[in-house]
């Protein structure tokens, strides 16, 4: 995720560190979705990610920084969705088909915990 650099305390250099950051973000999205941002703790996020809480703190100073990284992930997914929808072959569909395609894409986006929790917080 290219915008992630702005939300990380330390930039992961190795592939396994990048994978750990993704695991932390995936776990945080699940935990925030299940219990809410307010009720979530960095310890439960680390446990869900199957990593030590110290590893989490290497990359994120607190759960707000994790949430901010999830916001960036969501924004990138929305951008990708719009790029798909505004291809000429989609725009030229009959209106009903275009709306169906749009609704389907938005449903798929919000099936992901990241998008649900970002939306709920606002």
Region locations from a protein language model:
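N-terminal intrinsically disordered/low-complexity leader segments
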Residues: 1-19
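Generic hydrophobic, amphipathic alpha-helix propensity
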Residues: 19-28, 45, 70-81
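Helix-turn-helix
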Residues: 23, 31-65
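Hydrophobic alpha-helical connector segments
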Residues: 69, 84-111
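Short, Lys/Arg-rich amphipathic alpha-helical interaction segments
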Residues: 88, 121-122
